[in-house]
């Protein structure tokens, strides 16, 4: 699997993501800087977490307007898989690649802890390694992860199977509507999620529940 990791000022989870992709796919990803307007031929583009541009204006608002984003939008339109984690999710929403909005946590506090996720849709290219309804562990670390969508949008994404993960067993850390933790686009090649699967992929992390997300994409691409 050929992958690419986007690097922007303020993102600080790029090294974690690079390490995860390298360990699982066996190939180190290429890195893409904010000013680049062309992206190499890759199977997966990842926008990692952090605080791009200091979260000024809104989380992800400035990053979504950088030159590299148009290149990502173009690749997504051609079916290339795109994953946004934490701030990456916020950027994808701001760029219009995913529906809804991400607001300040209902507690008005930064939350950093382990939560539980239910696999709501196990038929996506990112979740095939999991079972439908499976509950997995995953860490979160964010201040603005409260997912919201208006009634029409919510009905559409629920009806279309675009909700991929929900916070489970009462562990919703941010007040997200319907406990939504991850959504994808209608086409199914763009996924955004607040939890950090890259930080739970091996025994040294205390578990490997996040590994299935990357393994799923790898298996689909290799098929």
UniProtKB/Swiss-Prot annotation:
The GO biological-process annotations, alphabetized, read as: 'de novo' IMP biosynthetic process
Q: Does the keyword Transmembrane apply?
A: no
Concerning PROSITE patterns, the annotation shows: GATASE_TYPE_1 (PS51273)
Give the molecular function GO annotations: ATP binding; glutaminase activity; phosphoribosylformylglycinamidine synthase activity
Which UniProt keyword terms apply here? ATP-binding, Cytoplasm, Glutamine amidotransferase, Hydrolase, Ligase, Nucleotide-binding, Purine biosynthesis
Active-site feature positions: 86, 196, 198
Q: Does the keyword Nucleotide-binding apply?
A: yes
On assembly, the entry states: Part of the FGAM synthase complex composed of 1 PurL, 1 PurQ and 2 PurS subunits.
Please give the name of this protein.
Phosphoribosylformylglycinamidine synthase subunit PurQ
Taxonomic lineage of the native organism: Bacteria, Pseudomonadati, Pseudomonadota, Alphaproteobacteria, Hyphomicrobiales
